From Swiss-Prot:
Cellular location(s): Cytoplasm
Alphabetical list of PANTHER family matching this protein: GUANYLATE KINASE, GUANYLATE KINASE-RELATED
Keywords, comma-separated and alphabetical: ATP-binding, Cytoplasm, Kinase, Nucleotide-binding, Transferase
SMART domains: GuKc
Name the record gives this protein: Guanylate kinase
Organism of provenance: Psychrobacter cryohalolentis (strain ATCC BAA-1226 / DSM 17306 / VKM B-2378 / K5)
Reactions catalysed according to its record: GMP + ATP = GDP + ADP
Positions of the Guanylate kinase-like domain: 3-181
Gene giving rise to this polypeptide: gmk
Length: 208
């Protein structure tokens, strides 16, 4: 059985990473693709778990060798998704989440046309500013850069299949789970999962 590809995008500070983390903790057969990046690790980040940290030269070489499903430059740092890794997980029947920006999302959609695209929005710019400041990961200069680009990022929601407003974490998480569950009940997925059962039902045979 082939897994589904879910692309989740949001402006920085919207709560995407926290939602995905909780979703993974409560959902079976679901994983998140670990991106490659040239940025420096933040406190507490582990190489190979949060990101595959690399340098610019190695990243550029990987681009030239077409190793990335998508890649983009964000605030002076490069980010990319390994195509080989994603395809291997999907072929193993695992649903895969890509946490990437809207540029990368549109790149991936051209290759995986069945990918399910989800955009998460904050309830307001004021809330977004507060969340960016509270998490204490970036300087005020970086926060202002992120806010300046947030409106343009959020305007891309029209290119996505689903939109979630993260005003209440629990409500947003429930809505995110609902999208995953609904996809797993589609005709294509159920035919793959229950092929033998359906065959037996339609042939009037009893499975011993």
């Amino acid at each position: 059985m082939t897994g589904s590809l879910f692309i989740i995008t949001a402006a920085s500070g919207t709560g995407k990473t926290s939602l995905v983390k909780q979703l993974l903790a409560t959902t079976n057969d679901l994983t998140v693709s670990v991106s490659h990046t040239t940025r420096e690790p933040r406190p507490g980040e582990i190489d190979g778990h949060h990101y595959h940290f690399t340098d610019v030269n190695k990243f550029v070489t990987a681009i030239s060798e077409s190793q990335f499903l998508e890649h983009a430059e964000v605030f002076g740092n490069y980010y990319g998704t390994s195509e080989q890794s994603v395809r291997a997980q999907l072929d193993a029947g695992v649903d895969v989440i890509l946490e990437i920006d809207w540029q990368g999302a549109l790149q991936v959609k051209k290759i995986f046309t069945d990918a399910i695209m989800i955009f998460i929005l904050p309830p307001s710019i004021a809330t977004l500013r507060q969340r960016l400041s509270t998490r204490g990961q970036d300087s005020m200069e970086v926060i202002e850069q992120r806010l300046a680009g947030a409106v343009n990022e959020m305007a891309q929601y029209v290119n996505f299949d689903y939109v979630i407003i993260n005003d209440s974490f629990e409500v947003a998480l429930t809505e995110l789970k609902a999208i995953i569950v609904a996809d797993r009940q589609t005709l294509k997925r159920q035919q793959q999962r229950y092929q033998r059962t359906i065959t037996n039902l339609l042939s009037n045979t009893v499975d011993e």
